[in-house]
């Protein structure tokens, strides 16, 4: 069964490469991609706690992690996809990763003023206190947001973002309405040095930013009164002068009781400030 699934993964990867190769024939189109297959074979080594029983009750004698991804661009348009296979996941990776399929795909249009992306999105607001989606293949982590993102740049130095969608949770269906939450967020950032002509060449640098994110998830807990809409907001300031830099950010989130925090109804807060100095060959950062 594993061999057949692996063959299906390799065949699907080959078909993707062939199909995207045809698109690359279009003049001015660019295509790039990569693939990787990691494997482990396990042998009994009681010195590090690997026994016949642990192999039998664990993932088995071997583990395989594989992926292939393709990105295509033509003018203002870009698109891509990633196909993954865990047959089964290697030791140290979550067993819920086991499976084969198209894990990620997206299509995006950006003309400099407005950008629209449909599909799986990776982004963050500020330092990522209240919204951050990213993928780290070596750790088996991926919390991409499948939905829509719009970025609008009405004038020089001003960037507005809006996102909407559902986050990836292993191979769980995005269509599930009760078990999957919907994430909605907006973010704005104003770079004063770009917006104000008198500050274009100034040694003093300043930017302001703010975000709001809400999560909706139906309450299916028969015991606790869980809020279905949970909101969080964030504000940040970045300042600099010459070789010095200062940044501060504050985030607040209303109560979000769940099994992960033992159903506490306390609100959450986060604060980060940093002072930095840098020159050629030397740099220092102080953070609180």
Question: What spans do the regions from the language model cover?
Answer:
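N-terminal, Lys/Arg-enriched amphipathic/low-complexity engagement segments
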Residues: 66-68
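Surface-exposed extracellular loop regions of Gram-negative outer-membrane beta-barrel proteins
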Residues: 122-129, 133, 288
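Bacterial Sec-dependent N-terminal signal peptides
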Residues: 1-31
């Amino acid at each position: 069964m594993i061999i057949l699934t692996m063959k299906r993964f390799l065949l699907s990867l080959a078909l993707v490469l062939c199909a995207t190769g045809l698109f690359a024939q279009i003049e001015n189109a660019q295509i790039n991609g990569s693939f990787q297959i990691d494997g482990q074979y396990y042998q009994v080594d009681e010195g590090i706690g690997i026994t016949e029983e642990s192999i039998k009750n664990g993932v088995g004698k071997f583990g395989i992690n594989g992926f292939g991804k393709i990105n295509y661009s033509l003018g203002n348009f870009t698109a891509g996809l990633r196909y993954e296979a865990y047959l089964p996941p290697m030791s140290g990776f979550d067993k819920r990763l086991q499976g084969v399929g198209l894990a990620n795909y997206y299509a995006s249009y950006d003309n400099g003023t407005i950008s629209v992306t449909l599909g799986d999105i990776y982004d963050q607001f500020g330092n990522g206190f209240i919204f951050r989606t990213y993928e780290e293949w070596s750790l088996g982590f991926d919390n991409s947001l499948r939905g829509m993102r719009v970025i609008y740049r009405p004038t020089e130095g001003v960037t507005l973002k809006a996102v909407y969608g559902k986050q990836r949770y292993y191979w769980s269906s995005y269509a599930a309405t009760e078990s999957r939450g919907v994430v909605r967020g907006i973010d704005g950032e104003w770079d004063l040095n770009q917006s104000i002509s008198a500050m274009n060449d100034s040694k003093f640098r300043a930017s302001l930013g703010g975000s709001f994110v809400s999560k909706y998830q139906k309450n299916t807990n028969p015991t606790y009164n869980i809020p279905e809409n949970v909101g969080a907001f964030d504000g940040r300031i970045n300042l600099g002068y010459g070789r010095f830099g200062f940044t501060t950010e504050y985030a607040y989130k209303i109560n979000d009781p769940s099994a992960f925090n033992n159903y506490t109804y306390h609100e959450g807060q986060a604060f980060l400030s940093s002072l930095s100095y840098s020159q050629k060959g030397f740099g220092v950062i102080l953070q609180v």
